[in-house]
């Protein structure tokens, strides 16, 4: 019984530590730019592993320095209900589930909020564990950050090509101009 009690206390303490540290990280990123994400480190590792040159282009820009049409285009193409939901588009989730049950190709139903949670706090992958943790972080960022901050972090952390992350890096790499000049 002593060992079981120690295991239970240790498990409780670990869960409490994970909960508190996740809250602290989300609160910190409400105010601090997200300069690097787990995905960036994973991609650099893959480049090294595959003996490719390391490419990591990323420059944080405040939302007001990113062209409004870019944000509008992202919402239109990725999550047209972004301003109307609390992080989850239940209709798209149900459609994706129905398609999967019919044996159709699995399609994404992740919102901008879910993608931001994944990009900033997690790793790429398609496991139920990662999706569960993603849902937890999605609730936290919706609650603590709000839509404007979620959009700002999304536009600065999204992978937009091989080694290119965020609106400013893609604007420079593909259009040779700053993100605020995109139309």
For the regions a language model picked out, list residue spans one by one:
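Juxtamembrane regions of bacterial inner-membrane/periplasmic proteins
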Residues: 2-182
